[in-house]
Amino acid sequence: MAHVGDCKWMSWLPVLVVSLMCSAKAEDSNCGENEYHNQTTGLCQQCPPCRPGEEPYMSCGYGTKDDDYGCVPCPAEKFSKGGYQICRRHKDCEGFFRATVLTPGDMENDAECGPCLPGYYMLENRPRNIYGMVCYSCLLAPPNTKECVGATSGVSAHSSSTSGGSTLSPFQHAHKELSGQGHLATALIIAMSTIFIMAIAIVLIIMFYIMKTKPSAPACCSSPPGKSAEAPANTHEEKKEAPDSVVTFPENGEFQKLTATPTKTPKSENDASSENEQLLSRSVDSDEEPAPDKQGSPELCLLSLVHLAREKSVTSNKSAGIQSRRKKILDVYANVCGVVEGLSPTELPFDCLEKTSRMLSSTYNSEKAVVKTWRHLAESFGLKRDEIGGMTDGMQLFDRISTAGYSIPELLTKLVQIERLDAVESLCADILEWAGVVPPASPPPAAS
């Protein structure tokens, strides 16, 4: 009886283990974005935030926390507001925006740009983002531009007063250098166009001579009709010579041989005709078979992502926490698709792209063998290995796919395909913050 009781206990043991694992995973799924499940108290606890000038190292959130999680100071020329934000690069006021530095940046604050540099102006109808603060050269400014009126008048007055001198103002030097660069660029364009046209002409001439010296098809195929025409003549002559040959052999054996040979000919012709009919019927049957349609209908960005999510939910046996997180990310993605439809990745802010590039780098997570990097993302876009080898980070990949005509929703779809939902979530949050759209409220988690 004791042995029977032990067997019953062993049969219930796997069920208890599975139930305990499911309850633990359900508890992890109830934790928020910046919360982890405390095994001691059994409750969700807030991840330790970082101070200003620091960024989080490793990952913490959604019920899990790495053992090496902590905060590290920002490197030089970068800043962070603290909390759970990563360090971002300071604004390059003079190099990128062509503006003066109003307040230099430090580890806790970003740099603030002032007015435009001399000889530059700001567009009136500029976009309401970081690119709207870029200053442009007065050489390309429309007439009567307020910022460029004093510069152009000063240059004209100075040139009229010192017409006989050899000294030039810095603005005139810049104008002279720009004009020289413009002439050089024009000469390069003309030279490249000439070389391209000459190469096309050489290729066309070579193809013309090849087609001219190539023998024509009817000349090659003229011999079989000649042979077929000679064949009936030979058979006709043999038919004419047949009676004479019969007379020359009076023996019965030889006569029987001659008379027996024509009887075999109809039989062989019937066999050949039957074989030809069989081959013809086979060819007709094979021609009537419909060819498979290899061209699939193009799928929309959102529909393909929803189909991918359904397929993942059916085939994979993942925990309820990961499924709820995937649903949250898909809801945010659906909202982002309507905001950035038709926009290329390079139209996003520089800090947003740099953050995504860092998340896709090989040094972002310690699990290098599991987490996919920007190289896997490049392979999903169909780039060749030699082209991927010439890139150093995700920023160059974003420039490449933007040049190829890919949009932001297509980039998000590829990130989901390589199982980088953390990058999708971070990029969607930055896009909504940049566009000023409130993210959709996530539904409460289902009770296990």
From Swiss-Prot:
Region described as Disordered: spans on this chain: 220-297
Pfam families: Death_EDAR (PF24979)
Superkingdom classification of source: Eukaryota
N-terminal signal peptide: 1-26
Subcellular location: Membrane
Gene Ontology CC: apical part of cell; plasma membrane
Polar residues compositional bias, start-end: 258-283
Entries under InterPro entries matching the protein: DEATH-like_dom_sf, Death_EDAR, EDAR_N, TNR19/27/EDAR
Single GO MF annotation: transmembrane signaling receptor activity
Transmembrane annotation, as ranges: 188-208
Membrane topology: Single-pass type I membrane protein
GO biological process, one term: salivary gland cavitation
Associated disease: Defects in Edar are a cause of the downless phenotype in mice (the equivalent of anhidrotic ectodermal dysplasia in humans). The disease is characterized by sparse hair (atrichosis or hypotrichosis), abnormal or missing teeth and the inability to sweat due to the absence of sweat glands.
Assembly and interaction partners: Binds to EDARADD. Associates with TRAF1, TRAF2, TRAF3 and NIK.
Identification of the protein by name: Tumor necrosis factor receptor superfamily member EDAR
Gene: Edar
